[in-house]
Amino acid sequence: MSELLFSLNFLLLLLLSCVSPSSFFTFNNPVVGLGACGPHQIQAFTQFKNEFDTRACNHSDPWNGVWCDDSTGAVTMLQLRACLSGTLKPNSSLFQFHHLRSLLLPHNNFTSSSISSKFGMLNNLEVLSLSSSGFLAQVPFSFSNLSMLSALVLSNNDLTGSLSFARNLRKLRVLDVSYNHFSGILNPNSSLFELHHIIYLNLRYNNFTSSSLPYEFGNLNKLEVLDVSSNSFFGQVPPTISNLTQLTELYLPLNHFTGSLPLVQNLTKLSILHLFGNHFSGTIPSSLFTMPFLSYLSLKGNNLNGSIEVPNSSSSSRLESLHLGENHFEGKILEPISKLINLKELDLSFLNTSYPIDLSLFSSLKSLLLLDLSGDWISKASLTLDSYIPSTLEVLRLEHCDISDFPNVFKTLHNLEYIALSNNRISGKFPEWLWSLPRLSSVFITDNLLTGFEGSSEVLVNSSVQILSLDTNSLEGALPHLPLSINYFSAIDNRFGGDIPLSICNRSSLDVLDLSYNNFTGPIPPCLSNLLYLKLRKNNLEGSIPDKYYEDTPLRSLDVGYNRLTGKLPRSLINCSALQFLSVDHNGIKDTFPFSLKALPKLQVLLLSSNKFYGPLSPPNEGPLGFPELRILEIAGNKLTGSLSSDFFVNWKASSHTMNEDLGLYMVYGKVIFGNYHLTYYETIDLRYKGLSMEQRNVLTSSATIDFSGNRLEGEIPESIGLLKALIALNLSNNAFTGHIPLSFANLKKMESLDLSSNQLSGTIPNGLRTLSFLAYVNVSHNQLIGEIPQGTQITGQPKSSFEGNAGLCGFPLQESCFGTNTPPAQHPKEQEEEEEDEQVLNWKAVAIGYGIGVLLGLAIAQLISLYKPKWLASLVIKSRNC
């Protein structure tokens, strides 16, 4: 939340002012630092910056951000924000600054560096910030040497482990480890509870857990801000929380807390109480509405019930934001809320009231700016022009309200900036007056039955609308001329047709355009090359993709799949250094594989399937393909040829490690548009997965998929594919691959779908496949495989068709027995266990004796063992996937 970030920044500034006595140079005169710094310090700083790519730094004043002690010449403060790119190594010159008291290196790109134990040598540090800089792995225990630290900020990295490094940091007043992967049980002996001077503690978005919030939090009685959002805390909030009498902000959302609401009545300084997304039950204490400084209260998404009582003295309440949606209140709750006359934000969404809500009940809330009644039953009469609701409203959300007519009451809301009417039954046309609302900037009216636009197109063109989302309606005909101020326009799944109008080229503020799933024809206008996101999927567009991408083009995502495009892939795409997503699948593009795109540093998804790509898939130098950030590569249904070198997958760095799925789960475009409301926009791909073709919205950033099926690839499957630990789906079917199935498949622990059918693979199916506990689909049919099918839950659950067409394969689920007879009928588990035990003893004796009576029989059995691996030799320990 913005309030939390403001609190942290304020505290850091306060601490920095304490770190900077008069012997230091002031912040507003950094140039003086150059004259005060000793020659060795100047040399060390120059060496430090030379270790990185510093193109983002302020080169007009290279010493900006450096402070030196005017008596000793030692660097005592270093601040380089969003400036450095490269690996921070243990032998870095940074660790020569032994007199540093403040080190601020936030928002740099240290490219997945581990935090060096050498930081523990900087034992004069009082303020250390390494937030949002790409650090991973555990924080070294040497941090416990930094006993002078007052502030430690490690937020927004990929750090793991526990908080044991905080031991001995007894002077710590600010600790922020939010948005990482720290984990473990917070028990009473945790080093966290030894920080008796802590005033700001942020554990948000980690994996901490406890059967209840530890009582020991109540001992940190100097705390002013406590945030444990989005962890795995269970149970009740302890009564000791009432000991934190200095607390001004308390954030507990998105955990598993139960019981009654925490006792906070004694926390008279509390201004923010955020309890969203838990399992709190019972009623709301009326005292919450009269707390002297409480301005923000979110109880949304719990199991609260009963009625709401607001004392008559509540007119003096400072409560400005109240979020009560998604609970189970009973009886009349709106009248009491109308007493809170200072409210600016009110969320009562999805309350499932048994009576219609009359909007005029909110007429007393003269300061109301935001009202969310989504999912509620709204009185039809209150949506007419005669109804009265506060004219101050800027945001109005009425989604999922079963509204059938466009609300005329909007005409009176001249301050309205944000409208959300999605998932209703509104039919007819957009009224002309809507676009005349003077401050209207964001309109979300998706999933309705609207067919067109009333009146003159000039009204829409001259409106103030910047964000317009009209997905899944019945809009038809030509695309209307968009507002001159438009920034985001989405009309997915409508019936628009004809050419994309060239007037769109005059919309200089347009960043996102999504016209997917319509009936547009003709060419793609070249001017659209300047967008951030361009989505034209599943239309009838023709011609070639414009080759108009100039240097530093901001394009992040281009999807023109499922059209009738021809020609070649634009060579100028190499200029799109920010490109993350490229889809041209299911067209008629005829070209060689675009090896040049591996130079794009951020490309994560490349979809080329069902075109006319031809020629070798291996690079001209026969080395690794080398897409550093690529996670999804689909090239199925082309005419690509050749073999894959043994190191083909070596440089696929992003696919070689898995990520925590709680953070950055999907490829998404996000933008704050009003307060806590965000515009989110997800990528979509068509994926052949587990033998089925499916459309997948919300593309994961934490997993990888590869589809090379339906080409003319040959040779062996490279063992280097076992490096791709994030791989969940692999399809190499319908090629001419030969050789053995790689043993390295056993390393693909996240694999869920594997299709190797219709190749010329030989040898046996690796036993390691049965250890892949997530593997739900396997198809190795129509190859030249031999031997027994490995027995395991993931393998034996496959249909017989997944193994057919291999003359030498035997064992379940095929009927062919590995001992030359038909597979015996199913037995009861006990009988089968006894028989297998007897068989195991018999066969081992036959092999071990070797000589004596029955020598020939023993040799025959030994030969069978060497060829087929009997079922009873497979020792199975498979853990089922925990759903």
Swiss-Prot record:
Protein topology in the membrane: Single-pass type I membrane protein
Keyword Cell membrane among UniProt keywords: yes
LRR repeat positions: 97-121, 122-143, 146-169, 170-195, 197-219, 220-244, 246-267, 268-291, 293-316, 317-340, 342-364, 365-390, 391-412, 413-437, 439-462, 463-486, 487-506, 507-528, 529-552, 554-576, 578-600, 601-624, 627-651, 701-724, 725-747, 748-772, 774-797
Signal peptide from the UniProt entry: 1-21
Gene3D superfamilies xref list: Ribonuclease Inhibitor
Cytoplasmic side: 868-883
Keywords: Cell membrane, Glycoprotein, Leucine-rich repeat, Membrane, Receptor, Repeat, Signal, Transmembrane, Transmembrane helix
Sugar-modified residues: 58, 91, 109, 145, 189, 207, 243, 266, 305, 312, 352, 462, 506, 519, 575, 731, 779
Localization of this protein: Cell membrane
Family classification: Belongs to the RLP family.
SMART domains per UniProt: LRR_TYP
Major localisation: membrane
One GO CC annotation: plasma membrane
InterPro entries in the cross-refs: Leu-rich_rpt, Leu-rich_rpt_typical-subtyp, LRR_dom_sf, LRR_R13L4/SHOC2-like, LRRC69/RLP
Keyword Membrane among record annotations: yes
Membrane-crossing segments per the record: 847-867
The protein, known as: Receptor-like protein 40
Membrane topology, Extracellular segments: 22-846
